[in-house]
Amino acid sequence: MTDRVEINGLKIARELHDFAMNEVLPGTGVDAETFWHSLSQIVHTLSPRNRALLSKRDDLQAKIDAWHRANRAPSDLQAYEAFLREIGYLLPEGPDFKVTTSDVDPEISQIAGPQLVVPVMNARYALNAANARWGSLYDALYGTDAIPETAGAERGKGFNPQRGEKVIAWARKFLDESIPLRNASWADAARLSVKDGKLAVDFDGAAADLADPAQFTGYSGEADSPREVVLARNGLHVRIIIDRNHPIGSTDRAGIADVVMEAALTTIMDCEDSVAAVDAEDKVLAYRNWLGLMKGDLEETFQKGGTTVTRKLNQDIRLTAPDGSPIKLPGRSLMLVRNVGHLMTNPAILDRDGKEVPEGIMDAMFTALIALHDIGPNGRRMNSRAGSMYVVKPKMHGPEEVAFAVELFGSVEDALGMRPNTIKMGIMDEERRTTVNLKECIRAASERVVFINTGFLDRTGDEIHTSMEAGPMIRKGDMKQSTWIAAYENWNVDIGLLCGLSGRAQIGKGMWAMPDLMAAMLDQKIAHPKAGANTAWVPSPTAATLHATHYHQVDVKAVQEGLKSRTRAKLGDILSIPVAVRPNWSPEDIRQELDNNAQGILGYVVRWIDQGVGCSKVPDINNVGLMEDRATLRISSQHIANWLHHGVVTPEQVMETMKRMAEVVDSQNAGDPDYEPIAPNFEDSIAFQAACDLVFKGREQPNGYTEPVLHARRLQKKAQDRKGAAADSSRG
């Protein structure tokens, strides 16, 4: 039984209450009585409306299901569009407008660059991400497949000089392209110095300067013998580290020991899809790490290579400007926080009727209270120098739900004494009803919006669930080539530019999900800035370092200017449904699809349920590591549910596949000492039961979301573990 403290009609888990009282409130300028009174008022005012919005989702889905049962996949798109307008799914588009968001940090409003998303419950990951503002290009190239392991350039255990030479050559070529010298190459540089406020590069007696002297930002150390020189292109900095005593610098003609990229400009500290937070214990862990990030004192100590390492937040970088004045560059990524959406409740707080409080309301109040340690009256201003708090709000369906979030944020600001519109909003364009009404969604948050982002993973899950009754969907791997997805990606950019986001907000693109395949990422992910996105998601600090090179190659502001005049993507294309009109899959095709989906589901769910790990690199059926979170789970589970519903596969076939793939997942996790095998005790495995629920009850899940099943089963597993621990203790 959870120990609770009752205040103003709220029954708060003692763990959360004590955390707020002892750790969060001191230093914010907000007194405890005001905080709890305001939280109660917000909960009891807004919770009924939150529930009404969820009921509207269900009502619209029921009408769409009935329409598809009568019509199947629409051959008459005009009739389908008219139906969606009639039921209020597709809303009238209002006149053109421009967003008016103000007090936005340049990392969001002005500079294009990579964005990390990291589970805030993992302090080490969170610190690594925050510190990924800067990343070693040498390390990123040497340690990944970005440099081929051919012609003697294998990674191996020790340092390979041949591989090192290829890394240095790659980096010098990058410098030649990004920050060119006048009539010279960085490959031939012998010495760097600063003379008369300009960078001078010597070449054994000859000298060259930058083709564009304005690219020189500053240096540290002595002008005649700097420790580093800092250059810039498209607003992104590059630090050339000079150290002739360093193992690399000592062998380099110019003494260059490293090239350090400005990499993850922004990081989303995630309380949502990449975490498993089901109760007060979990929420306190998430909030405590967010608190440490906002106060600047988060630390994590761990063992690495037999030594104890303590990780903390990096300090700002102090430099001398070309004119001799002191300047600072931020040492950390600008942090946003992703709250949960409108769907879930959490037992951490109960309302006066004993109902669990909507988790999105709880997140808004607690993450904002914590942010006061950065932007409040006594705040450090070490995250947002502009004095704003950035909240990414996921999984909203249409402008009415965005307006509800805007009202929630306003209520939180009033409660905490924040100026109006201090809390900025990132809108995830990952639900179909938001996509088709995107302009009106942005209008609803026009004073707060700092971010729109296509999340094609969740968006595909919603696509499948919305049109579940239309027919069997095409194979999952074919989705990226479907008509709707290309239109969706372009539509997001088109609408964002139309609404004036350029120069004020981010227009983002989705995740590169293969953290080990960096050569492929370097080749392909440049498509995101070329498409007009001024940020895109990457799975690791290393990936951020490499993806940053794309923003040197592409001037996103110029791309956006060019795109403003193109013809807008077509609504009809977005509304086209990816059903297989005449499926002709062979039994082998079906088996492969089923195996792939089932293995992905089990590989992710078993860690979520048994270990509380919400985001991890899960080997796929071909043992390629993929970053999995609830979005990928939503697609896979909905896809099997769809094929089951339309008779492409049978329940027996699916169950046989799930059991067979459980053995594959067990073998893939054989090296994990904390792993609990699924097979052969399928009935006893809560994780296996959760995976089966997601598939066999997939049509019943609200909008195809996985959270209700995952939360219920994780709570069951935690209770089982506590019971087992108590039994062990009594025996001991």
Curated annotation (Swiss-Prot):
Its cofactor is Mg(2+). It is found in: Cytoplasm. Glyoxylate binds at R338, E430, G455, F456, L457, D458. InterPro entries: Malate_synth_C_sf, Malate_synth_sf, Malate_synthase_TIM, Malate_synthG, MS_C, MS_N, MS_N_TIM-barrel_dom, MSG_insertion. One of its GO terms (molecular function) is magnesium ion binding. It catalyses: glyoxylate + acetyl-CoA + H2O = (S)-malate + CoA + H(+). Its main location: cytoplasm. It comes from the Bacteria. One of its GO terms (biological process) is glyoxylate cycle. Involved in the glycolate utilization. Catalyzes the condensation and subsequent hydrolysis of acetyl-coenzyme A (acetyl-CoA) and glyoxylate to form malate and CoA. Belongs to the malate synthase family. GlcB subfamily. This is Malate synthase G. It comes from Chelativorans sp. (strain BNC1).
